[in-house]
Amino acid sequence: MGLLFNNLIMNFDAPSPWGIYFQDSATPQMEGLVELHDNIMYYLVVILFGVGWILLSIIRNYISTKSPISHKYLNHGTLIELIWTITPAVILILIAFPSFKLLYLMDEVSDPSMSVLAEGHQWYWSYQYPDFLDSNDEFIEFDSYIVPESDLEEGALRMLEVDNRVILPELTHVRFIITAGDVIHSFAVPSLGVKCDAYPGRLNQVSVFINREGVFYGQCSEICGILHSSMPIVIESVSLEKFLTWLEEQ
């Protein structure tokens, strides 16, 4: 139960029943996405109440007036036409510029400290650390399969646990190089603000900077076959000392 408490109560880094909001952010790009969502939601709420007030006012005036068609000879109103043309344009600009800025910032991959190659297969992920060698002087690499429900430990998350986690150091610029070996997959970890399609024969890349320790869960987000739901992703962020110890054990 300790694992479940740490993952779901202290930090919401995994899907939870009846969840209605984002998982807790662990990277600057995810914090930016949450802030953008909240700002856009503010505009949407204002629009909702504004349009609702106008609609209710029209209905009330229509019901209370003696002549239901008292404005049948009104052809146009220049002022109101300007208002309903300019106001949406201004709102769209206020939404567009922050989203464009965030989009370009998320697309930048500058001077990463290390790289991880993630390759999607039917139906598992394989990972490679091209910057580090194991005891056989080969790149550190491994496959990551879902843990069957019959093998889950108490407190583990169903359909989300894997046999081999991706271990990364916190406070480090990491570049994920993402591809696929058969069909199209998608590498998605909500707490990290990462969602990148994996195409056979093509390399995509995303940058992450994990600002705290934790275990972050994701899944393949592109329908890729009958066991599409059996491709979880688990990334564990640890201190630099623990990461170096893990490297020595490989």
Curated annotation (Swiss-Prot):
Q: Which residues bind Cu cation A2?
A: 220, 222, 224, 228
What topology in the membrane does the UniProt record assign? Multi-pass membrane protein
Give the enzyme's EC designation: 7.1.1.9
GO cellular-component term (any)? mitochondrial inner membrane
> Which positions, given as ranges, span the membrane?
28-61, 78-107
SUPFAM superfamilies reported for this sequence: Cupredoxins, Cytochrome c oxidase subunit II-like, transmembrane region
Kindly list the positions annotated as binding Mg(2+): 222
Ranges facing Mitochondrial matrix side: 62-77
The record's remark on the cofactor is: Binds a dinuclear copper A center per subunit.
UniProt enzyme class: translocase
The UniProt GO MF terms for this protein read: copper ion binding; cytochrome-c oxidase activity
Binding residue positions for Cu cation A1: 185, 220, 224, 231
Its GO biological process annotations read: ATP synthesis coupled electron transport; mitochondrial electron transport, cytochrome c to oxygen
Q: Which cofactor does it need?
A: Cu cation
Q: Chief localization class?
A: mitochondrion
Recite the UniProt keywords alphabetically.
Answer: Copper, Electron transport, Magnesium, Membrane, Metal-binding, Mitochondrion, Mitochondrion inner membrane, Respiratory chain, Translocase, Transmembrane, Transmembrane helix, Transport
Q: In this UniProt entry, which residues form the Mitochondrial intermembrane topological domain(s)?
A: 1-27, 108-250
- Catalytic activity entry: 4 Fe(II)-[cytochrome c] + O2 + 8 H(+)(in) = 4 Fe(III)-[cytochrome c] + 2 H2O + 4 H(+)(out)
Under the heading NCBIfam families, the entry gives: CoxB
Please state which protein family the record places this protein in: Belongs to the cytochrome c oxidase subunit 2 family.
How this chain assembles, per its entry, is: Component of the cytochrome c oxidase (complex IV, CIV), a multisubunit enzyme composed of 11 subunits. The complex is composed of a catalytic core of 3 subunits Cox1, Cox2 and Cox3, encoded in the mitochondrial DNA, and 8 supernumerary subunits Cox4, Cox5a/Cox5, Cox6, Cox7, Cox8, Cox7a/Cox9, Cox6b/Cox12 and Cox6a/Cox13, which are encoded in the nuclear genome.
The protein here is known as Cytochrome c oxidase subunit 2
Q: Provide the species name.
A: Neurospora crassa (strain ATCC 24698 / 74-OR23-1A / CBS 708.71 / DSM 1257 / FGSC 987)
Gene that encodes it: cox-2
